[in-house]
Amino acid sequence: MSSVVEGPFRRSIVSSLTPAPLRTMLRTDDGVCIEAVYEPCTAGSAATAIVVAHGFTGSVDRPAVRRAAQVFAQRAAVVTFSFRGHGGSGGRSTVGDREVLDLAAAVEWARSFGHTRVVTVGFSMGGSVVLRHAAMHGGRKEAHTDAVAAVSAPARWYYRGTAPMRRLHWVVSRPLGRVVGRFGLGTRIHPEEWNPVPLSPVESVPLIAPTPLLIVHGDRDPYFPLDHPRMLAAAAGEGQAELWLEPGMGHAENAADEVLLGRLADWLAGE
């Protein structure tokens, strides 16, 4: 890990004179070290920074995450990071619970570069995290988000209505499943169950307003059917969320093509 810089980050102003990505380790409020990458906007200095929260088993260096970052960087600066238990980050995954602290650290780091707007976008598990983060950090100036987009997010916990989700629950909840997660999927999963159970995405959504909220979901998502995004949009209240139902789209960042990513970037950048 000699190529990373660990320790407190400094406040700085980013311009087109600093085009190279910056990789570092962030420390969360509960002491977990999180790998993160900052990429300036390729079009020059930008007011907005987009913080990207990947899905379960993803990481900062996964091709789908890098593809999204490249598209987003055409409109804004971008921060990507690996959730705890993923990639080069420390700790073990809590599958959406304490990951809110990882996102908060990434948002604070993005703000340290002087951007006037910092927005979040999350995919699948990351989608649930950005919703909970927006609900929980609205009053915390340095860690709050100015807009939030959730892609392929679940509305409720413990969903087992599809075969992929039943397999995922086996990976997370069984000792042999966690071995498969670690050595087969590269994800280190915490063995303890949630206690207490965190606020669910659908319970979080009503607490997000007046922060702009976008919910995106594919009509061919094999994990979460369309009642999930519709439930989230309804919970937000009339006029409090945009809902994009994408024809032919599957699940999360792996299914997001460059056209959709470009539309997301425009929405997040306020264009």
What are these regions (language model features)?
Residues P8-V14, P21-R23, I34, T94, ...:
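The alpha/beta-hydrolase serine catalytic core
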Residues D29-C41:
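A short loop-to-beta-strand scaffold at the N-terminal edge of the catalytic core in hydrolase folds
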Residues A46-G55:
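Short beta-strand element of the alpha/beta-hydrolase
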Residues F56-A69:
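The serine-hydrolase catalytic nucleophile loop
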Residues R62, R84-D97:
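Glycine-rich "HGGG/HGxG" loop immediately N-terminal to the catalytic nucleophile
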Residues A69-G90:
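Conserved alpha/beta-hydrolase
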Residues T94-F113:
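Alpha/beta-hydrolase active-site loop
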Residues E108-R167:
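Primarily recognizes the serine-hydrolase "nucleophile elbow" in alpha/beta-hydrolase
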